[in-house]
Amino acid sequence: MSISLQNINNLIDQDVQRFILECDVQYYKSLQTVVDTIISVQPQKPIILLSGPSGASKTTTALMIEGILDNLSITTHSLSLDNYFISFTKEQVELALNGKIDLESPCRLDIPFLNDQLIKMINGESVALPKYDFKKDQRILTNRILTRIPNDIVIIEGTHALNPDVISIPREKVFKIYVDVQQSVIFDNCTLRPPMIRLVRRMIRDKRYRNRSVQKTFEMFTNCLLYTS
C-alpha cells in the first residue's frame, strides 16, 4: 500500500484542515471494529495492552480508542509505559548521551512497580500514577490518582506492552492490540518505507517532547530497530 508525496502535497495545498480531518476519520473507522471487539469481551478483560514499533502511533491510537469508548459511556484511561521508566543518575545520563545505554531495552522499565500497579488497577485499588520527565530523566509520582471501578477500561501502550517478561498480569484479564505503519510514500522514483516513516515521526516527537536532537534520534534508531522492526 503506497501513496505519492505529490498527491499528499496537492491535498494539503487544497485544504490542509480538511486533509487532516479526513485522515483522522479514516483511521477512526478502521478502529471501530477493534472497539467493537473490546466491548464484546468486557468486563472480563479490563486491561488493554497496545504495542508496536517506535513511531507507529501507539499513543495516538490509544487516545483515539479511549475517545471512542468514552463517547459510548465506557470510562477509559490511557497510560504510557514510558512513565514507568527508571530514573537516570547523572552518570547514566552521560552514558546514554554517548550511546552506551540501550534506551529501548525492557530493563529501562521498573517492572515490579508496573505490575504492582496493574494488579491494583484490576482489583479496583487506588494508585498514584507516575510521570517521566524526559528533560530531567527522572520519574516522579503525580497527584493523579486512578481508581478503576467495575466496567472501566485501562489502556497500557508502549513498545514492550506485549512483552511477557515485562507485564505478567493474568492473561485472562488482558486484550491485546498491535499497531504498525503499513503505507509507503513514493517520491522522485524513491520509496519511503514504513520504518523510515516511523523514524521521521520519532524525530519530530523527540525534538518536541524529549529534548533530543534529530541527529541523536537518528543515531539511536539502528539500536531501536533491534527491538521494534
Question: Which stretches of residues belong to each language-model region?
Answer:
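Charged, amphipathic alpha-helical linker segments immediately N-terminal to NTP-binding catalytic cores
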Residues: 1-28
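Hydrophobic anchor at the beta1->P-loop junction of P-loop NTPases
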Residues: 50
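Conserved lysine of the Walker
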Residues: 58
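Hydrophobic positions on the alpha1 helix immediately C-terminal to the Walker A/P-loop
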Residues: 61
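Short beta-strand-centered segment that lines the nucleotide-binding/catalytic pocket of NTP-utilizing
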Residues: 72-88
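Conserved nucleotide-sensing/catalytic segment adjacent to the nucleotide-binding pocket
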Residues: 92-133
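ATP-dependent NMP and nucleoside kinases share a basic, alpha-helical "lid"
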Residues: 156-201
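Conserved small/polar residues in nucleotide/adenosyl-binding loops
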Residues: 227-228
